[in-house]
Amino acid sequence: MYLYDGIAGIVLFLAKYLDRYQDSSCRQDVEKIYKLAIEKLEKYTDLRCEQNEVPEPLATGLYDGESSIVYVYLILYEITGQEKWIKNAQKHFEIVAKLLPKDENMDYLSGNAGAIVAAMKLYQLTGEIEYCTAAVETEKDLWKKGQRMEVGYGWKLKNLKYPLSGLSHGNSGFLMAYVELYKMTYDQEYLKKIKLLLSYEDILYSEDLKNWIDLRDPDGRKTMRGWCHGAPGILLSRMSIMDILPDDKQIKKDILRAVSTLFHNER
């Protein structure tokens, strides 16, 4: 059902297609599929809201969790301007709110780091303080679950010896949450935490491999060039940080590193 590999992702793709290609020869067919996908997504929201107890385990994350549905509704609002999507997002966030204290995933993909991003976007678009409060309180609990490293800070996820680099499960994903918190609150504590997360992730960059090491590999010599792990996702996080630290030399250096890695071996 989620954005990463389910109906929500299909809805978003079709919505962007319909917005971009107004005169497409297959528009009518796409609209039919889009309508069916929307109906399924809204029925899912209704079903979850009707349940007195939210079944476990349900993930909270922005891509592979309940927050992904909130996020897609909000993007639909930005595309169409229709208030119904804001209402749907608020309705579905009621489900997310029940799950926040139970989260064990923590990361951007499936956990509360991603949920914070959804909550802050909801706050940005509605101005309703309850969503900012939910994000702020969730961050407090999230930070307590992390570990101060010899350099910087990170989160050791299940069955892992060290915190990871990267967007899905690593510091780049957590950085996305802290950037949104700082952008909407200007709380200097978030900026300090951003710098700690950057410090740890940057020590995982290998000059030899020209990429950030994937510590899921016991030998510590594996790298990836995917959205989830490696330079592409890290590039996205650094670009988001440029909004708040436009003159930071290390951020600019990381962006150049990531771009170079992304197009390595391209002719």
Where are these regions (language model features)?
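Glycan-recognition and catalytic cores of secretory/periplasmic carbohydrate-active enzymes
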Residues: 1-267
